């Protein structure tokens, strides 16, 4: 699973580069998280929800993965809104955190919502929030 964290970063970068349309970027980013989590749910649970994540090397890898994903998102936010990098990074971390936590929740609960329904709900709430920032 540790090497797969690089595949998540790549998937997020690919989602962002896939289109200039920000609503589709958000949708693709959320889908990338659900893909990542669903591909190997047991390994994901072990890594994120067990004592493994207190190990310094594992924790560092998880933090790096989150930072790299948020940095990819924040670059677009900063460019589109003119927000300073620090503010854009905070929003990027929030967006990535929301995607990660909601995808985990969906997986953990063996939800009656289909994956597509869950992704659409999360995409909708995140897009409605981030799209409120004026473009520069």
Segments from the language model and where they lie:
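Short secondary-structure transition hinges
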Residues: 24, 28, 35, 39-71, ...
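Amphipathic alpha-helical packing segments from all-alpha helical-bundle domains
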Residues: 4-10, 56-79, 89-97, 101, ...
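Amphipathic alpha-helical interface segments
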Residues: 32, 36, 40, 98-105, ...
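Charged/polar, low-hydrophobicity segments characteristic of intrinsically disordered regions
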Residues: 128-136
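Hydrophobic alpha-helical connector segments
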Residues: 14-39, 95, 119
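Short, solvent-exposed positions on alpha-helices
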Residues: 20, 24, 45, 86, ...
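Amphipathic alpha-helical linker/stalk segments
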Residues: 1-28, 73-76
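Short, flexible helix-adjacent loops and helix caps
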Residues: 13-20, 49-52, 74-82, 104-111, ...
């Amino acid at each position: 699973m540790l090497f797969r964290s690089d595949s998540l970063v790549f998937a997020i970068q690919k989602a962002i580069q896939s289109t200039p349309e920000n609503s589709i970027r958000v949708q693709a980013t959320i889908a990338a998280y659900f893909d990542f989590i669903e591909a190997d749910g047991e390994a994901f649970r072990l890594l994120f929800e067990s004592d493994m994540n207190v190990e310094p090397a594992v924790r560092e890898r998880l933090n790096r993965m989150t930072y790299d994903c948020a940095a990819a998102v924040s670059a677009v936010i900063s460019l589109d809104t003119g927000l300073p990098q620090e503010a854009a990074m905070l929003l990027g971390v929030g967006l990535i955190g929301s995607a990660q936590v909601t995808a985990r929740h969906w997986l953990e609960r063996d939800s009656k919502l289909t994956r597509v329904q869950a992704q659409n709900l999360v995409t909708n709430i995140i897009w409605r929030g981030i799209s409120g920032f004026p473009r520069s």
